[in-house]
């Protein structure tokens, strides 16, 4: 069993006993890890603190991925509830990326995150990049506090882990990841349901995947990139725009890959960067983004900034190529 900071455990345990209301937060454009962590914690509260109330903020508005697995809220949560709540923020590296921003209304805030620390914005924080996923952190947290995992918690945690580790294939996967996964499997949760929720996509989304792959350009230095036109996703019947960076995974000779699309809700360009072994979060940070060593994201005001980012990364790869030649 790993050891979590006893100061964090002690303080969080006291807050769980003190507060009756819990507002749970994820990052903008939430993925299965963010939701997996938040809904696993909500399920934990429902079992061990049944008289307390908890809601995952902003989940009532989610249109796409996750609705077949997570019990999204039916309606927005009233500010009066939030003002009397303990806000717990999951999988979010900086304050401006907290979905709804309602955490600022809460009485106190807690943050649980596995991204490299770039800022502090909660009263109590547990930040540890050694974990493969925020959901993995929640699983260990529940166990470390002396509670058991049930099948519902396990399903949500497993969804988060397989998403952020790319089915246990990424370098972020550790022995502790497999150790927790073994405990999750012991609960007997329905793995097929989780796999279907995470991986099954409509035919039109597969066609969109192919479109992105065909749209991509690959430089001689090993950079693959795709800049998607505004509204492209609509012609494929996709409910909301997606980064689709995974369309460029596993191309031989490609060392770094990135995509960028226009988000009509926030009127900005959103992009993702991935690599297998080259640290790329520093590139995202140059443009106000951030993330993990090999997986990062950014938000831009102008698509020309994306092409500048492409130029910077390609120059970096060219220099690496020269050094290694």
Swiss-Prot record:
UniProt cross-references to InterPro entries, sorted A to Z: DDH_dom, DHH_sf, DHHA1_dom, Oligoribo/pAp-PDE_c-di-AMP_PDE
- Output the Gene Ontology terms for molecular function: nucleic acid binding
Similarity comment: family membership = Belongs to the mgp1/MG371 family.
Entry-linked PANTHER family: BIFUNCTIONAL OLIGORIBONUCLEASE AND PAP PHOSPHATASE NRNA
Name it: Uncharacterized protein MG371 homolog
**Species annotation:** Mycoplasma pneumoniae (strain ATCC 29342 / M129 / Subtype 1) (Mycoplasmoides pneumoniae)
